[in-house]
Amino acid sequence: MVSAEVLRVERTPAPIRAQVLDNLRQAILDRHFAPGQRLIERELVELTGVSRTSIREALRELAAEGLVTTIPNKGTVVATLSAEDARQLYQVRSVLEGLAGKLFVENASPAQRRALAKQLATIDRLAARDASILEAKDRFYDILFVGGGNVALHQTAASLHARIRALRSLSLSLPGRARKSVAELHDIIEAIDSGDAEKAARACRRHVANAGAAVTRALSALT
């Protein structure tokens, strides 16, 4: 069972609803709750220290993100992503990120290009000391999508973010995958710096293909 320390909501200026949602989402992504595990409202109220209404609102949002699902006569459970689910998600991710890389070359400002390179340097430093690069990679992709200038594309990617991040966490847990992932990000930056939009798109798609293969291996190891 997840500890109260993980989920406890602090009394800060941030809205309670946002804190509950963030804490529950992170607990799922960090696998404090196992896929298929039932989430009991009463227990979540005790762990977080918030009202049942706040818990229900958070669970509805997590359902919209695809992280939990409601099963008749059982209640809310943590979603289980199968290898087929992952394959379909990464097909879509390949299209989205390939286009994002292309549009970044075509539309990004010099400041956005510098920001992307700076973020990769941050990822390098984290990887060098075997620290988690998940959040730093999230920021890298944010810069990439924003720099492309297509709001609809960014919104579509954001709608899949929670499920993809859960799978990314799995893939990066494989020995050697984090360093290979960082090397692939360098390939993306190199392609962007070349000014070749199609080359950047290919580098992004290649990175997603390799990540997808890693996810499949990670899911197979869990079964």
Where are these regions (language model features)?
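Short amphipathic alpha-helical segments with heptad-repeat character
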Residues: 87-94, 172, 201, 205
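Short arginine-rich
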Residues: 209-219
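Hinge/beta->alpha junction and helix N-cap segments in small-molecule ligand-binding domains
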Residues: 176-177
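Alpha-helix N-cap/N′ positions at the starts of helices
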Residues: 73, 96, 118, 180-183
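Conserved amphipathic alpha-helical segments that form helical-bundle/coiled-coil interaction surfaces
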Residues: 108-170, 182-190, 199-209
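Short, flexible turn/loop "capping" segments at secondary-structure junctions
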Residues: 37, 69-70, 137, 180-182
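Short linear motifs at protein or domain termini
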Residues: 1-106, 217-223
